[in-house]
């Protein structure tokens, strides 16, 4: 029991420390893509910039909107972070105190539930920008989650089990590019960052949050980014830390290179392009592997 608690705490420490440094890594990559240096003043080459930014955020005052439910407003960011944290337990590489036989099904439940935290956070903030961002996130999730579930079902058919594990198979490379599009949509990253949409919605669903609540939302967002980089490494390339950071770099460069889609084009892309392709992949694995 004590060993299990120690491993759970170590996973949380690992995730939070990783988030601190991948955010710094992202800011340097975005700076390089725009021909500027990026953060380089705090300590050696800005190495501790993310830690000082976190301390500064924690010192800010948390303001609750006048007509908002204070309890819901405070609880939602914590639930958002917990959902992200639970996602790490579907990958059997960071702990050894249990065997998760149906980790893929548990993962589908988590990503289905995660959109509710975004939706509720926008609703309880009583802000028109937050509300529009929440509605966008919910309709966006309906668009990609069906295709995403079918892709994972095709992978289940291929590996003949409901548990994530590390393997390397060339036949799954055809699924990688569509999977990348759906990961971008799940993470609300450009070009599918409609829930935030800085140029349209100020900051979207988290526009009213500050201090600890914003830190939890931030940790949840970037923790999910790091998790999906790890998941992609596990599914398509074998578990490798090099592949994890290569995948993270790809996600950052997509943000710096591509503008935001039009909302109707995003819906059309997932419903009429990726969904039929996912059905084709599923039919292929069912017919030729069984």
Curated annotation (Swiss-Prot):
Keywords: Electron transport, Membrane, Mitochondrion, Mitochondrion inner membrane, NAD, Respiratory chain, Translocase, Transmembrane, Transmembrane helix, Transport, Ubiquinone. The chain crosses the membrane at residues 2-22, 73-93, 104-124, 142-162, 164-184, 212-232, 234-254, 269-289. It comes from the Eukaryota. One of its GO terms (cellular component) is mitochondrial inner membrane. InterPro entries: NADH_UbQ_OxRdtase_su1/FPO (IPR001694), NADH_UbQ_OxRdtase_su1_CS (IPR018086). Its EC number is 7.1.1.2. GO terms for molecular function: NADH dehydrogenase (ubiquinone) activity. It is a multi-pass membrane protein. GO terms for biological process: aerobic respiration. The keyword Transferase does not apply. PROSITE patterns: COMPLEX1_ND1_1 (PS00667), COMPLEX1_ND1_2 (PS00668). The keyword Disulfide bond does not apply. It is found in: Mitochondrion inner membrane. It catalyses: a ubiquinone + NADH + 5 H(+)(in) = a ubiquinol + NAD(+) + 4 H(+)(out). Belongs to the complex I subunit 1 family. Core subunit of the mitochondrial membrane respiratory chain NADH dehydrogenase (Complex I) that is believed to belong to the minimal assembly required for catalysis. Complex I functions in the transfer of electrons from NADH to the respiratory chain. The immediate electron acceptor for the enzyme is believed to be ubiquinone. This is NADH-ubiquinone oxidoreductase chain 1.
